[in-house]
Amino acid sequence: MNVSNHQSTRAKVLIAKTSLDGHWRGVSLVARALRDAGFEVILGGMLRPSQIAQVARDEDVDLIGLNVGGRIEVVYRIMDELRAVGLDDTPVFCGGTVPPGAAAKLRDMGVEVYPPGTTLAAIAEAAGRLTAER
């Protein structure tokens, strides 16, 4: 994989799954691409919304990436949990199966959406932009 290093300092990214759909390939590929691009990646695995917020706070992450597996309502709960622990300014992106109408709602909330087919290079580039803006 040829993903250039977008980071001058190692930004920290939490990658987590939000559903029990059993598909790990995309999560693993995104985590690897971000590592290859110079990010420190915390692979959280399958976590509840409160756990995602706790890990993000405890690890002082710069960015949160979520595999939503079609369950968009869980992203709303995660955003609420992030606000509750004072991380409402931490950028969030999600991927996986996201219905078009839900993608627009997520974007309105400030969540970046990367549907299936988005290149790993595009995700790494966006992660670099999102962490540089902080």
Residue positions per predicted region:
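Residues within well-formed alpha-helices
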Residues: V30, V55, E125-A126
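Cofactor-cradling patches in redox/metallo enzymes
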Residues: R35-E112, P116-A122
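Two-component system phosphotransfer/interaction surface
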Residues: T119-A132
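ATP-dependent carboxylate/acyl-activation modules
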Residues: N2-I42, A132-R134
